[in-house]
UniProtKB/Swiss-Prot annotation:
Similarity comment text for this entry: Belongs to the nitrite and sulfite reductase 4Fe-4S domain family.
Subunit structure: Alpha(8)-beta(8). The alpha component is a flavoprotein, the beta component is a hemoprotein.
UniProt: [4Fe-4S] cluster binding residues: 443, 449, 488, 492
Molecular function via GO: 4 iron, 4 sulfur cluster binding; heme binding; metal ion binding; NADP binding; sulfite reductase (ferredoxin) activity; sulfite reductase (NADPH) activity
Keyword Nucleus on entry: no
Binding site for siroheme: 492
Catalytic activity of the protein: hydrogen sulfide + 3 NADP(+) + 3 H2O = sulfite + 3 NADPH + 4 H(+)
InterPro entries assigned: CysI, NiRdtase/SiRdtase_haem-b_fer, Nit/Sulf_reduc_fer-like_dom_sf, NO2/SO3_Rdtase_4Fe4S_dom, NO2/SO3_Rdtase_4Fe4S_prot, NO2/SO3_Rdtase_4Fe4S_sf, NO2/SO3_Rdtase_FeS/sirohaem_BS
Protein name as catalogued: Sulfite reductase [NADPH] hemoprotein beta-component
Length: 589
């Protein structure tokens, strides 16, 4: 089967389609035979195409890798269960919804936890197949769903979390919701399978369905969108396929958006045809044209994106293949209007404001630091219970941040003391969290992620403990370095926008990247390859010592590494990301 498309001049067009394209074409608008698999008691998982199709419904099949070998020895299949990721544009959720979600996690998930993600939503881990319809029906009852939070669609739309400029944030959040809804699939397959629980009986039913934006075969690959309000880059906007940078009119109102496209952080070890890249500027649009711009970028990627090689199918590769000017021109043609010139903007940081902050409307917002976003009652901590107890009395809302933290938002002055008392009682407010730890992040990795090559979430606390000691040794404890660990090169931990990024290479081994910046606008350079955590700490001890002794006033670690030539900056990732001659430490090794 070869590509049949109206587009011309793309080298991949005459190559065979990837099998995922066949799968989508034959899926009956994402229904497949999922309902049949739900009735099969012989396996805890899904068979054939359904293994992939459930991803379009916001789920991944996983197993507990800690006991995989043990179960194999006992002639048992892996302990299979599902990860579910909710669709939650901007990360806002009501306390009443949270109470019900907490109950489900405790009663029906293997790990009895809720994981806050860096895409501003939550995940259930370890949900057995028999509980999936129960879970989706609960989400539906709560006004939530998980459609399009995975697979080849526009994923959960991010929006700057900290609501200091309340009116501007409200307006930006409304557009995040509108963009999310506008780019959703139109198929009823999700409802038919998970809520109604019935098969479509006639082929005529399929003739009535259409996907005017995504198309019958949806997008070539995953697609990520964010709305960001400068000067805070908490959503890491340069790592997304599509970004809307909210521009104020000077009076706290939304003037419009700068539109950026082509960011993405995944790669494949040793494959120089893959690379992370920051998003590029297309132009400015007024608010009323934001949806047109979103649709135009998505449909351009739909029609020009690589459907032969999934490793080169993201928007950044489409822009590289077409050229930025041609990509922009095609988007403008589809919008029916040209972009205006980019409006000036600047980012000054991207960490969350931990603690209490007062909004301009007089309400208070408490940002709770949640290490790696994991809410669970274990190891003497009752973080999950703490959030539940707050939810029982909170009159505002919760906001999940893109840094895996939780904001107890819109707290009245009269309720502030009680909220803080509960947070302290359950360990949600701690006095021993360093700035370094507040600015660290990890993906989930072992034991549930099937792609994990090395630990991430489970080693982050101890790794930061050791890095804190190094910071103290060199007199920099009052400062921070944006540090991220990801268990494989797929980019979920956003290590490719960190000052210090660890990327899993094999069991207990990582590639060490340095030279990103605090604002999240530069890709870090590979510094040392395939080394252990103790070896990484030894390298960082030396480098942090140099930073402490030789840095300029206010100079971050990543900027120092670039200025002093420890590594050369990644200036044009498609060309120089893999250029090891610019990784000074490797060249001299």
């Amino acid at each position: 089967m070869t590509v049949q498309t109206k587009t011309k001049g793309l080298a991949w067009q005459e190559k065979p389609l990837s099998d995922n394209e066949r799968l989508k074409t034959e899926s009956n608008f994402l229904r497949g035979t999922i309902l049949d698999d739900l009735k099969d008691p012989l396996t805890g998982g899904f068979k054939g195409d359904n293994f992939q199709l459930i991803r379009f419904h916001g789920m991944y099949e996983q197993d507990d890798r800690d006991i995989r070998a043990e179960r194999a020895e006992a002639k048992l299949e892996p302990l299979k269960f599902m990860l579910l990721r909710c669709r939650l544009p901007g990360g806002i959720i009501k306390p009443s919804q949270w109470i019900e979600l907490d109950k489900f996690a405790r009663e029906n998930s293997h790990y009895r936890s809720i994981r806050l993600t860096n895409r501003q939503t939550f995940q259930f881990h370890g949900v057995p197949k028999a509980k999936l319809q129960t879970m989706h029906r609960l989400l539906h009852k709560l006004g939530l769903d998980s459609i399009a939070t995975a697979a080849d669609m526009n994923r959960n739309v991010l929006c700057t979390s900290n609501p200091i400029e309340s009116e501007l944030h409200r307006q930006a959040y409304e557009y995040a919701k509108k963009i999310s809804e506008h780019l959703l699939p139109r198929t009823r397959g999700y409802l038919d399978v998970w809520v109604d629980g019935k098969k479509v009986q006639s082929s005529d039913d399929f003739l009535q369905e259409d996907e005017p934006i995504l198309g019958k075969t949806y997008l070539p690959r995953k697609f990520k969108t964010a709305v960001v309000i400068p000067p805070l880059n908490d959503v890491d906007c340069y790592g997304n396929d599509l970004d809307f940078v909210a521009i104020s009119d000077g009076n706290g109102q939304l003037a419009g958006f700068n539109v950026l496209a082509g960011g993405g952080l995944s790669m494949e070890h040793g494959n120089t045809k893959t690379y992370p890249n920051i998003s590029l500027e297309l132009g400015f649009v007024p608010p009323e044209h934001a949806l047109k711009a979103a649709e135009a970028v998505v449909t351009t990627q739909r029609d020009f994106g690589n459907r032969s090689d999934r490793k080169n199918a993201r928007t950044r590769y489409t822009i590289q293949n077409m050229g930025l000017d041609n990509f922009r021109a095609e988007v403008e043609r589809r919008m029916g209007m040209p972009f205006e010139p980019i409006r000036p903007f600047k980012f000054t940081g991207r960490g969350d404001r931990i603690g209490w902050v007062k909004g301009i409307d007089g309400n208070w917002h408490l940002t709770l630091f949640i290490e790696s976003g994991r809410l669970v009652d274990e190891g003497g901590k009752q973080l999950l219970t703490g959030v539940l107890e707050i939810a029982k009395i909170h009159k505002g809302d919760f906001r999940i941040t893109a840094n895996q933290n939780l904001i107890v938002a819109n707290v009245a002055e009269a309720d502030k003391a009680k909220i803080e008392e509960l947070a302290r009682t359950y360990g949600l407010i701690r006095n021993d969290v360093s700035k370094l730890r507040e600015n660290a992040m990890s993906c989930v990795s072992f034991p549930t992620c099937p792609l994990a090559m090395a630990e991430a979430e489970r080693v982050l606390p101890d790794f930061i403990d050791e890095l804190d000691k190094i910071m103290a040794k060199h007199g920099t404890s009052d400062d921070y370095i944006v540090t991220r660990i990801t268990g494989c090169p797929n980019g979920c931990g956003r290590a490719m926008l960190a000052e210090i990024g660890l990327v899993g290479k094999a069991v207990e081994r990582y590639n060490l990247h340095i030279g990103g910046d605090r604002e999240g606008v530069r890709i870090p350079r590979l510094y040392k390859e395939n080394i252990t955590l103790p070896e990484i700490l030894a390298e960082l001890d030396d480098l942090i010592g140099k930073w402490a002794a030789e840095r300029n006033i206010g100079e971050g670690f990543g900027d120092f590494a670039i200025r002093t030539g420890i590594v050369k900056p990644v200036l044009n990732a498609p060309v120089d990301f893999w250029d090891v001659s610019k990784a000074v430490a490797i060249a001299r090794a």
